[in-house]
Swiss-Prot record:
The lineage of its organism: Bacteria, Pseudomonadati, Spirochaetota, Spirochaetia, Spirochaetales. This is Type III pantothenate kinase. GO terms for biological process: coenzyme A biosynthetic process. Homodimer. It comes from the Bacteria. The active site is at D111. It catalyses: (R)-pantothenate + ATP = (R)-4'-phosphopantothenate + ADP + H(+). K(+) binds at D132.
Length: 262
């Protein structure tokens, strides 16, 4: 990769994985992940950067829900790129085309916040329901007029699957996959069906209910690393965007309002 090309590096530090996205000309040209490990060392992360990031960047924006790793990444980015990264969060001031806090400010994970901002800023939509299937399953609604309306947080597919394996003595581990039928006749098939149909009904149920509650139409956007196995089951119209979170982080990073103190 051309080392002279200036780019934006977006990092999403999640509970299960850490996503890295390189933006060039407003497009994602590189998207890779590494497994999250609370014991990650400086040398491990530096080696990962050296192996994968043979380019220069002029900006680095980070969203993190694992604060214990923040300092390592801040130090490595400064050492590697000679710049200080900007950490985005819900409680900073941003210059956006809508007010996310129209319904009042409340504590919100930076990844969820990034999803909701990207849903409004990147699409010509007025009301959006965003479902993110990662370590957690988050389902939040946002409106261009009213801001963030709120949402639900549940455990994600892999958390549920591993919890079942840990607590069912006779159940052996097997690869999860999209179920072919609602009613299956094998144990593994029935587990797959139960695992993914619960999210289908949860997402579709929330989608239909918020339309009744708010008496308006909503668009559904689905994202998250575990979403691909669920998509064939969804029976309402939706947009799938695997890069939604990093796009939102980038928007927020470029929209931070810096206050100068005399």
């Amino acid at each position: 990769m051309n080392k002279s090309l200036l780019s934006e590096l977006i990092i999403d530090i999640g509970n299960t994985s850490i996503a890295f996205a390189l933006f060039e000309d407003n497009k994602v040209n590189l998207f890779i992940k590494m497994k999250t490990n609370l014991m990650l060392s400086y040398d491990e992360v530096y080696s990962f950067f050296k192996e994968n990031f043979d380019f220069n960047v002029n900006q680095v924006f980070i969203s993190s829900v694992v604060p214990v790793l923040n300092k390592i990444f801040e130090n490595i980015i400064f050492s590697f790129f000679k710049i200080k990264p900007l950490f985005i969060s819900f409680d900073l001031n941003y210059d956006l085309t809508f007010n996310p806090y129209g319904s009042g400010k409340f504590l919100l994970g930076s990844d969820v916040f990034a999803n909701l901002v990207a849903a409004i800023e990147n699409y010509s939509l007025e009301n959006v329901l965003v479902a993110d299937l990662g370590t957690a399953c988050t389902i939040f609604a946002v409106s261009r007029q009213d801001g963030i309306l709120g949402g639900l947080i549940n455990s994600g597919p892999l958390i549920n699957f591993n919890s079942l394996l840990d607590n069912a003595y006779l159940l052996n581990k097997f690869p999860i996959s999209t179920p072919t039928n609602l009613l299956e006749r094998t144990t593994s098939g029935s587990v797959n069906s139960g695992l993914f149909y619960q999210y289908k009904y949860l997402i579709e149920g929330v989608y239909h209910d918020i339309k009744k509650i708010y008496k308006r139409g909503f668009n559904l956007i689905i994202t998250g690393g575990n979403a691909n196995l669920l998509l064939p089951l969804i029976e309402v119209e939706f947009i799938f965007n695997i890069h939604l979170t990093v796009e939102g982080i980038r928007i927020l990073g470029n929209s931070i309002v810096v206050k100068f103190v005399n």
